[in-house]
């Protein structure tokens, strides 16, 4: 019998379940636990290989006869906002992004609950309680931050703090970028395009920190839920041969970038 080292990650495969993105298909995932002193290094390595983090689990799709889920990362220092993106930035000029430690609050959960009720009422997270939310935020063995997006107040120029909470992003800090784990916003503020704004803000943050990439998770061609990720260009998409550069929708480099 072979005895595995405690430092050697063990990988497991889930049973098939209905795909939440492509009707009529089933999904499977391969996953491992992110624990111990080297959890951050392992998360870095696995993210580069197309994994995503959820609490202390790193996973990626391992579906039979389907490779629709494609990992996407934006090239931060080459990104130039389009006219539409500049409009989103201008529309949210009254918003301050405040980075904090990964500590959940009742104020965050209130926005999270409203977001789920309005946009994901029948999804897998619909029944999450305040304790479930706290676990989602706190159960991390890697470098994780909360970014709160608030409206500017009369004293914001002095204190650097905003007032009403509008949106929240749970973000991992990797050796080569920022990975957006989960984000949500107040549904009454839908006209602000906060989902887009948070990605634009993360691209700007990565650039300021000298980090080359912003990881957006999976893009799925043909899924309306995932179409928005293709708009942030240039970007790289993970293929069997490595990360391929995309400069325009539908275009890909013929050689891996890394």
Swiss-Prot record:
Keyword Transferase among record annotations: yes
Reactions performed catalytically: N-terminal L-glutamyl-[protein] + L-leucyl-tRNA(Leu) = N-terminal L-leucyl-L-glutamyl-[protein] + tRNA(Leu) + H(+); N-terminal L-aspartyl-[protein] + L-leucyl-tRNA(Leu) = N-terminal L-leucyl-L-aspartyl-[protein] + tRNA(Leu) + H(+)
UniProt EC number: 2.3.2.29
GO CC terms, sorted: cytoplasm
Molecular function in Gene Ontology: arginyl-tRNA--protein transferase activity; leucyl-tRNA--protein transferase activity
Coiled coil region boundaries: none
SUPFAM superfamilies: Acyl-CoA N-acyltransferases (Nat)
Key words, A-Z: Acyltransferase, Cytoplasm, Transferase
Database matches in PANTHER family: ARGININE-TRNA-PROTEIN TRANSFERASE 1, ARGINYL-TRNA--PROTEIN TRANSFERASE 1
The family this protein is said to belong to: Belongs to the R-transferase family. Bpt subfamily.
The protein's name in its UniProt record: Aspartate/glutamate leucyltransferase
Naturally occurring in which organism (per UniProt): Bradyrhizobium diazoefficiens (strain JCM 10833 / BCRC 13528 / IAM 13628 / NBRC 14792 / USDA 110)
Phylogenetic classification of the source organism: Bacteria, Pseudomonadati, Pseudomonadota, Alphaproteobacteria, Hyphomicrobiales
């Amino acid at each position: 019998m072979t005895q595995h080292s405690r430092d050697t990650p063990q990988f497991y495969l889930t049973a098939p379940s209905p795909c939440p993105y492509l009707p009529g298909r089933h999904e499977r995932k391969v996953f491992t636990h992110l624990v111990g002193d080297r959890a951050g290094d392992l998360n870095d390595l696995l993210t580069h290989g197309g994994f995503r983090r959820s609490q202390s689990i790193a996973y990626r799709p391992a579906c039979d006869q389907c490779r629709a889920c494609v990992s996407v990362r934006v090239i931060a220092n080459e990104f130039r906002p389009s006219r539409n993106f500049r409009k989103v930035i201008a529309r949210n000029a009254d918003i301050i992004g405040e980075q904090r430690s990964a500590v959940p609050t009742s104020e965050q959960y209130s926005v999270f609950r409203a977001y789920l009720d309005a946009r994901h009422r029948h999804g897998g997270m619909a029944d999450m309680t305040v304790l479930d939310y706290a676990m989602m935020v706190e159960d991390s063995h890697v470098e994780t931050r909360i970014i709160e997006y608030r409206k500017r107040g009369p004293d914001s120029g002095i204190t650097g703090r905003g007032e009403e909470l509008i949106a929240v992003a749970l973000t991992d800090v990797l050796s080569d970028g920022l990975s957006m784990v989960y984000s949500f916003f107040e549904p009454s503020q839908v006209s602000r395009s906060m989902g887009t704004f948070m990605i634009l803000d993360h691209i700007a943050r990565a650039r300021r920190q000298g980090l080359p990439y912003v990881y957006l998770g999976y893009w799925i061609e043909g899924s309306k839920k995932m179409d928005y990720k293709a708009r942030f260009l240039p970007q790289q998409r993970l293929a069997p041969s490595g990360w391929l550069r995309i400069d325009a929708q539908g275009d890909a480099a013929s050689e891996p970038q890394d």
